[in-house]
Amino acid sequence: MAGMKEIRGKIKSVQNTRKITKAMEMVAASKMRRAQERMRAARPYAEKVRAIAAHMSRANPEYRHPFMVANDGVKTAGMILVTTDKGLCGGLNTNVLRASLQKFKELEEQGQKVEATAIGGKGLGFLNRFGAKVISQVVHLGDTPHLDKLIGAVKTQLDLYSEGKLSAVYLAYTRFVNTMKQETVIEQLLPLSSEHFDANDGTPATSWDYIYEPDAQAVVDELLVRYVEALVYQAVAENMASEQSARMVAMKAASDNAKTVISELQLSYNKSRQAAITKELSEIVGGAAAV
């Protein structure tokens, strides 16, 4: 009977755990839809800024912004690492951290030091344990990322590159593909390559141009900063959508596993109960036969 009592306790414990994971699955599903909406809403802004910057670059080929110039000979690179603040989202953070660690090693083999910016508590903890140099950080973004919270940390990297102190700036995050699939991405943020502006932006390479106030150079300077900030914001939005998707899938798997465990425990309980009843009947029959 002690075994049956222990099994009943385990069943109750797993049932309570399943209630929690089921609730977390439903919450993650709701947050995932909102995160996807924010992610999709951010894309047109970044694309429009890119299109305007592409037009201005063609119209003013003599001007090269520092973001578009390679800092050759510099032995330090920058890395913006985007992770989540919370766990329970499967291998999402593990994958991007593993890829980032590999990138760190590649840069070190090339004689490059790395100065990192952490967006998200998991990445910050990883960088501190790894012994990386963290020059700026943003944590506790919540479920809704705001650009004003990101600008300060990102600007640290942009300023260092503009001053010629970084050879390149890389951006590591998780790209949202669909609910069941997310991709780890490490891409070069700076210097901006011609590929950023060569894509068809819907504007013809014509002889006409806008009138810029105060002047074209000032507009380009401001526009490219906004463009890079938009790329980082888009990465954070993609990462948050990936986080909620991964958490929903992980919690669903946990709920399904809990259901399986409950069934197995219930079967063990029934076997123990049947064995106890059989034993009692045997004792009764044995006692009657003795009489």
Curated annotation (Swiss-Prot):
Biological process according to GO: proton motive force-driven plasma membrane ATP synthesis
Membrane topology: Peripheral membrane protein
Domain of life (superkingdom): Bacteria
Alphabetical UniProt keywords: ATP synthesis, Cell inner membrane, Cell membrane, CF(1), Hydrogen ion transport, Ion transport, Membrane, Transport
Single GO MF annotation: proton-transporting ATP synthase activity, rotational mechanism
Principal place of residence: membrane
SUPFAM superfamilies: ATP synthase (F1-ATPase), gamma subunit
Pfam families per record: ATP-synt
Subcellular location: Cell inner membrane
Stretches that traverse the bilayer: none
InterPro entries, sorted: ATP_synth_F1_ATPase_gsu, ATP_synth_F1_gsu, ATP_synth_F1_gsu_CS
NCBIfam families cross-referenced by the UniProt entry: ATPsyn_F1gamma, PRK05621.1-1
Family assignment from sequence similarity: Belongs to the ATPase gamma chain family.
Complex formation: F-type ATPases have 2 components, CF(1) - the catalytic core - and CF(0) - the membrane proton channel. CF(1) has five subunits: alpha(3), beta(3), gamma(1), delta(1), epsilon(1). CF(0) has three main subunits: a, b and c.
Role, per record: Produces ATP from ADP in the presence of a proton gradient across the membrane. The gamma chain is believed to be important in regulating ATPase activity and the flow of protons through the CF(0) complex.
Name of the protein: ATP synthase gamma chain
Organism expressing this protein natively: Burkholderia mallei (strain ATCC 23344)
